[in-house]
Swiss-Prot record:
The active site is at E330. Residues 1-20 form the signal peptide. The lineage of its organism: Eukaryota, Metazoa, Chordata, Craniata, Vertebrata. This is Zinc metalloproteinase/disintegrin. Residues 193-389 form the Peptidase M12B domain. The gene is MPII. PANTHER family: ADAM A DISINTEGRIN AND METALLOPROTEASE DOMAIN, DISINTEGRIN AND METALLOPROTEINASE DOMAIN-CONTAINING PROTEIN 28. It comes from Crotalus durissus collilineatus. Residues 397-478 form the Disintegrin domain.
């Protein structure tokens, strides 16, 4: 019988308040410092996993005790999740690190039906939670040990600049039909759709974070964790298929004109990424300051299209919640959702698809967004999001700690008897093109057009490319 592990964090008797502090999230006015102390209640003889499936924390916020319930976001990563970076001489280096025992959670506050939470427990607690209608940020204090945390309202973070931030999509949605309530859609798990995304980080981002790939990786993971929560009630399941960091140089011309960058990124994605990575949608995360007030742009209704199923987003805030909701906004354009108008409403201060990004962003879609998204899905029938993500790359690449592997690994070197792969060097044997994969047969790529995965919903079976051992997910019938 599987027993749920209960973890309680008790606070020291005297948490204190401060008036101003500089944190990773920015300059903060009015914050509390709390001192978590972990108390674990385990069955006798049980071994504590590094990151439990379910956790519970007791916190004091504004002097009042609250209980935070957390559950690991098990669907955060695709099973063939990969990470790619580039060596100084331009070599592409790809690894498949294990992400099953990750540290990213969703949750709620006890006795608060409207509460939400997205938390990283990798190094202390970092993330946000909604309590009694207010959004709070929690993060470890970097200048002390991991038990010291700051808790503060999002509204208490000083603005990084006064200029309003806008989406670059200018196409407006107009309809003479009255907006129905989202509940009239009768959405249920049978409507579930699945979107596998790849996040590409440009060279400016790599420089902005001082070449720290671990920091970039964790930031992307935290933001996709937030995205996944936002789409939950839309019955759209988001998973991260991979991260690519342009650590050597940009592979496209990243420029302040957002539409031009979007066009270039789409062209690169079409000719490069699908050949080596199964995914439904790709995003460029950039440090560049786009012209005007734009912080993101995307193609409307382009999901599953091999070229325009893309979006570009500026890393415009130190607070990952704000950038994550911009990423959600732009992906929603790909899913056929337009900007909200005055007749649209949600349960937040503002809605995700507002054309102007609020300083207090909402994690809620409007009634209009629900209708537009599912009208698009039902009418346009994008095929790539019908299939629940499956493992398409069975290679388990060894990694050292959290570092990206610095040597090229061509095959799974787990078996000495593998006729395609040298066990000692993880290199393919002479004459071998592959060692494993749905499009690999006797160490050779299967011919182009060979069916590798039969479609259960239409006649668009997935076929081999003749250039890879992977069975690519069909993206040509959106």
């Amino acid at each position: 019988m599987i027993q749920v592990l209960l973890v309680t964090i008790c606070l020291a008797a005297f948490p204190y308040q401060g008036s101003s502090i500089i944190l990773e999230s920015g300059n903060v006015n009015d914050y509390e410092v709390i001192y978590p102390r972990k108390v674990t209640a385990l069955p006798k003889g049980a071994v504590q996993p590094k990151y439990e499936d379910t956790m519970q924390y007791e916190l004091k916020v504004n002097g009042q005790p609250v209980v935070l319930h957390l559950e690991k976001n098990k669907g955060l990563f695709s099973k063939d999740y990969s990470e790619t970076h580039y060596s100084p001489d331009g070599r592409k280096i790809t690894t498949n690190p294990s992400v099953e025992d990750h540290c990213y959670y969703h949750g709620r506050i006890e006795n608060d039906a409207d509460s939400t939470a997205s938390i990283s427990a990798c190094n202390g607690l970092k993330g946000h939670f909604k309590l009694q209608g207010e959004m709070y940020i929690i993060e470890p204090l970097e200048l002390s040990d991991s038990e010291d945390h700051a808790v503060f309202k999002l509204e208490n973070v000083e603005k990084e600049d006064e200029a309003p931030k806008m989406c670059g999509v200018t196409q407006n949605w107009e309809s003479n039909e009255p907006i129905k309530k989202a509940s009239h859609l009768n959405l249920n798990p049978e409507h579930q759709r699945y979107v596998e995304i790849v996040i590409v980080v440009d060279h400016g981002m790599f420089t902005k974070y001082n070449g720290d790939s671990d920091k970039i990786r964790q930031r992307v993971h935290q933001m996709v964790n937030i995205m996944k929560e936002s789409y939950r009630y839309m019955y759209i399941d988001i998973s991260l298929a991979g991260i690519e960091i342009w650590s050597n140089k940009d592979l496209i011309n990243v420029q302040p004109a957002a539409p031009n960058t979007l066009k270039s990124f789409g062209e690169w994605r079409e000719t490069d990424l699908p050949k080596r990575k199964s995914h439904d949608n790709a995003q460029l995360l950039t440090s560049i300051d786009f012209n005007g007030q734009t912080i993101g742009i995307a193609n409307i209704g382009a999901i599953c299209d091999p070229k325009p199923s893309t979006r570009v987003v500026q890393d415009h805030s130190k607070i990952n919640l704000r950038v994550a909701l911009t990423m959600t906004h732009e992906l929603s354009h790909n899913l056929g959702i337009h900007h909200d108008t005055g007749s649209c409403s949600c349960s937040g201060y503002s809605c995700i698809m507002s054309p102007v990004i609020s300083d207090e962003p909402s994690k809620y879609f409007s009634d209009c967004s629900y209708i537009q998204c599912w009208n698009f899905i039902m009418n346009q029938k994008p095929q790539c999001i019908l299939k629940k993500p499956l493992r398409t790359d069975t290679v388990s690449t060894p990694v050292s700690g959290n570092e990206l592997l610095e040597a090229r690994i061509e095959c799974d070197c787990g078996s000495i008897e593998n006729p395609c792969c040298y066990a000692t060097t993880c290199k393919l044997r002479p004459g071998s093109q592959c060692a494993e994969g749905m499009c690999c047969d006797q160490c050779r790529f299967m011919k182009k057009g060979t069916v590798c995965r039969v479609s259960l919903v239409n006649k668009n079976d997935d076929t081999c490319t003749g250039q890879s051992a992977d069975c690519p997910r069909n993206v040509l019938y959106g």
